[in-house]
Regions:
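Signal peptide-proximal N-terminal region
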Residues: 56-78, 200-205
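Segments of small-molecule ligand-sensing domains
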Residues: 310-320, 331-400, 423-424
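Extracellular/periplasmic periplasmic-binding protein-like sensory domains
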Residues: 251-324, 336-341, 383, 394-423
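Beta-alpha junction/loop-to-helix N-cap segments that form part of ligand/metal-binding clefts
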Residues: 49-54, 69-140, 152, 212-220, ...
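N-terminal export signals
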Residues: 7-28
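C-terminal segment of N-terminal export signals and the immediately downstream linker at the start
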Residues: 23-43
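Extracytoplasmic ligand/sensor domains, especially the bilobed periplasmic-binding protein
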Residues: 102-210, 261-285
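Extracytoplasmic "Venus flytrap"
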Residues: 38-57, 81-87, 109-110, 180-189, ...
Length: 424
């Protein structure tokens, strides 16, 4: 099985729900002992670069927090495991909880993996704070009221924002629309959201082509030829893995982008690989919850970006923010619960304290809703190649809150998108 960020593979394996009795983390822990936090993230494969970016960020965050007293006076000790397929990742999650005795587990990028891991976390009464994983099957929330599981913003936020910015920046400038999107639920739902938003704003456009390459396809010439033959004047693509730079490079060589507007709502995952030499100007370019070059960046973001670029010689993307946000909200929850109870809190007490606590993350302020789904700040805008880097930045920055881009608790996504008050 190939790992994808938004795969929604249904997991019915025998290992998904163990027969072991639920366990409680004992609160009577030596207060000077290190606080062990498990990290599960991909380190290879199609999502490997994303996982590495998140791991680097959480290591930076832990070091910074430890210099300031750690979490409630305890130094943070990270225990890192790799996210791969659902079965193996669930086994590693159990090892972190049962053998390593971590106090919480953070990470997970693939929704296919997180759908399998989340029920295990509930069973084990173990805190799980996801970076980019959800418990959505397509657009349907499968775990509306978890006790211990905290999820990322909804899968579709970046597509909703990119679609709205296509309306804002390109309305009246295109008539023929094509899409090339990954062939699984994330790509198909993003494409449908784009179509519905155009319809809602009364934009009359002909949809002239749809291409559905499998994730990881590195020869996209046939897809590019089909797109070019359709003669679109706007192309929408929610590609975000290593195939996106390949598509842009091969499309440029074929002359696909000449006179064509583009919407790439998740492009920043591949930021460092999207070189100016094959990237046209003016793309609606999605940075999700962290734009590394923001002109009004916080002191926290500036410090992180400087350290990151000095050490790794590349720019960080939104997975860094997701990793920092997870640790920051966990820290806030532990300290709030300890203050309220007067002793080291149980995972249940931390889970009860975390929703609603606003923290400063790398990309701005964020919080978890009562249903334990994140609300953060999203950044996109038209791209420019007029900068000091070898990849595009944003000519102007559009900023939306997640509350403007994702359905409220209990809502149906497709009904919400028809009636919600939109920020454009």
């Amino acid at each position: 099985m190939k790992l994808t960020r938004r795969d929604f593979t249904k997991l019915a394996g025998a290992g998904m729900l163990a027969a072991a009795a639920p366990r409680l983390f004992g609160p009577a822990i030596a207060q000077n002992a290190p606080l062990k936090v498990g990290i599960i993230a991909p380190r290879s494969g199609v999502a490997g670069t994303a996982g590495e970016c998140g791991i680097r960020a959480v290591q930076w965050a832990a070091e910074r927090m430890n210099k300031d007293g750690g979490i409630a006076g305890r130094k943070i000790e990270l225990v890192v495991e790799e996210e791969t397929n659902p079965k193996d990742t669930i086994e590693r999650f159990r090892r972190l909880v049962l053998q390593e005795k971590v106090q919480s587990v953070h990470g997970l990028i693939s929704t296919g993996v997180s759908l399998g891991t989340a029920p295990v976390a509930e069973e084990e009464q173990a805190l799980l704070v996801m970076w980019d994983g959800t418990t959505q099957d397509g657009v349907k929330e499968m775990m509306p009221n978890p006790k211990y599981v905290f999820r990322s913003t909804d899968n579709e936020c970046e597509a909703v924002m990119g679609s709205l910015l296509a309306v804002k920046h390109f309305k009246g400038k295109f008539k023929r629309v094509a899409g090339i999107n990954p062939d699984y639920s994330y790509g198909r739902n993003n494409w449908e959201a784009f179509r519905q938003i155009l319809a809602r704003y009364g934009i009359e456009a002909e949809f002239v082509a749809e291409q559905w390459p499998k994730v990881g396809t590195m020869d996209l010439t046939s897809h590019i030829a089909a797109l070019k033959a359709a003669k679109p004047d706007l192309i929408f693509s929610s590609m975000l893995f290593a195939d996106l730079p390949v598509f842009m490079k091969q499309g440029h060589a074929a002359g696909l982008f000449e006179g064509v507007k583009m919407v790439l709502p998740a492009a920043a995952w591949q930021l460092n690989q999207l070189k100016k030499e094959f990237m046209p100007e003016g793309i609606i370019f999605g940075h999700n919850t962290l734009y590394f070059d923001h002109p009004q960046a916080s002191a926290l973001q500036k410090a992180f970006v400087q350290d990151y670029m000095d050490q790794y010689k590349e720019a960080p993307h939104w997975e860094a923010d997701r990793a920092y946000f997870a640790l920051a909200t966990y820290k806030a929850g532990v300290e709030a619960a300890q203050k309220a109870g007067g002793k080291w809190p149980t995972p249940e007490q931390v889970a009860e304290a975390m929703p609603g606590l606003e923290v400063e993350s790398l990309g701005g302020k964020g919080r978890f809703r009562k249903d334990k789904i994140a609300e953060q700040v999203f950044y996109q805008g038209p791209s420019t190649n007029a900068n000091k880097y070898d990849f595009p930045t944003l000519a102007s920055v559009d900023t939306f809150q997640a509350s403007q881009l994702q359905k409220p608790p209990g809502a149906d996504f497709w009904e919400w998108i028809k009636t919600a008050k939109m920020p454009v």
